[in-house]
Amino acid sequence: MKKHHEKKPKKIRAISINKILSSAQDEFILQGYKGATVQAIADNAGMPKANVLYYFKNKENIYHAVLEQTLNMWDEGIGDILPEDGPKLAIEKFVKAKITMSFTYPKTSKIYALEIIQGAQHLQGLTRTYLNTWVQEKAKIFQCWIDNSQMQPVDPVNLIFLIWSSTQHYADFDNQILTIMNRDDYKEDDITHVTNFLTDFILRGCGLKQ
């Protein structure tokens, strides 16, 4: 019985935190960090402001928690570029992972994009260390394939930027895309269609499509 009672508060805490972070995502996307307020986050979550501040002492802590959640999801969904895959399979996997992430978790992409646009003040350590290291490591893999004549000579870093920007566009600018397409939301087969289109386009540019 004791273990059952111990689990209940933890479950309630987890549910409350998820509600707060979900509400905070919407608020930060709509208002940005400066315009967002703890009161608005609490109202959107259907909770008293005091309850929000019980779990997070201030707006900055909430924002950092949202960013941490965002980066964890982004890191898990980014896919990887492995030497043993070869350039064609690596690009196919990378594009698919990024498109799936953008369509499944558009808010995650928007939060990250807004933080970067606003100067990345809360992410400076990450962009200068982890992301820089990741890009340089993957660029070396592409360069190795280029040197071994496994793909056309392209700028590896800009190739990564191209894949990032083209895939994340469907999340960051979903309102614009859906308006042009005269739709309320994406359809199930959009992920497959966009993945195939971008993969084919990028592979051709890298000399990997006959």
Placement of each model-derived feature along the sequence:
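C-terminal peripheral helix-coil segments that are non-catalytic and often amphipathic
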Residues: 1-4, 100, 104, 132, ...
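N-terminal intrinsically disordered/low-complexity leader segments
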Residues: 1-15, 22, 210
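Hydrophobic/aromatic residues within well-ordered alpha-helical segments
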Residues: 16, 59, 66, 70, ...
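Helix-turn-helix
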Residues: 19, 23, 27-61, 65
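Amphipathic alpha-helical linker/stalk segments
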Residues: 66-93, 138-144
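Hydrophobic alpha-helical connector segments
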Residues: 79-108, 148, 156-163, 192
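Amphipathic alpha-helical segments used for helix-helix packing
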Residues: 103-125, 174-182
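Short acidic/histidine-centered micro-motifs embedded in hydrophobic/aromatic stretches
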Residues: 111-115, 129, 162, 166
